[in-house]
Amino acid sequence: MNRTKLVLGAVILGSTLLAGCSSNAKIDQLSSDVQTLNAKVDQLSNDVNAIRSDVQAAKDDAARANQRLDNQVRTYKK
């Protein structure tokens, strides 16, 4: 039990020391990286939404073409 408390105390102390050693420049750089990644995610999301509408338009065109072909086949069978 005492060993567990000692290890836990060492982990907490180490975390505190590491947190105190981080510099504002590094935090600013990481914040900038996060903002850049968020912008890229937003752009990719917009691209996916644009592609979805293009895919739906292609599906609609294919359905209309298939319907026309079905109608032509019916007229030949008559």
Swiss-Prot record:
User: Which residues carry the N-palmitoyl cysteine lipidation?
Assistant: C21
Q: Where in the cell is it found?
A: Cell outer membrane; Secreted, Cell wall
- Where do the TM regions start and end? none
In the record, N6-murein peptidoglycan lysine modifications are located at K78
CC annotations in GO:
cell outer membrane; extracellular region
Q: Which domain of life is it from?
A: Bacteria
Alphabetical keyword list? Cell outer membrane, Cell wall, Coiled coil, Lipoprotein, Membrane, Palmitate, Peptidoglycan-anchor, Repeat, Secreted, Signal
User: How does the entry describe its membrane topology?
Assistant: Lipid-anchor; Peptidoglycan-anchor
What InterPro entries does UniProt report for this protein, alphabetically?
Lipoprotein_leucine-zipper_dom, MOM_Lpp
Q: Which residues form a coiled coil?
A: 27-75
Any one Gene Ontology MF annotation carried by this entry is: lipid binding
What GO biological process terms are annotated to this protein in UniProt? lipid modification; periplasmic space organization
- Spans of the sequence repeats are 24-34, 38-48
* Signal peptide annotation: 1-20
Q: Name one Pfam family in it.
A: LPP
**Can the keyword Signal be found in this entry's annotation?**
yes
Q: Could you give the subunit structure recorded for this chain?
A: Homotrimer.
Q: Which family does it belong to?
A: Belongs to the Lpp family.
| Function per UniProt | A highly abundant outer membrane lipoprotein that controls the distance between the inner and outer membranes. The only protein known to be covalently linked to the peptidoglycan network (PGN). Also non-covalently binds the PGN. The link between the cell outer membrane and PGN contributes to maintenance of the structural and functional integrity of the cell envelope, and maintains the correct distance between the PGN and the outer membrane.
Protein known as: Major outer membrane lipoprotein Lpp
By which gene is this protein encoded?
Answer: lpp
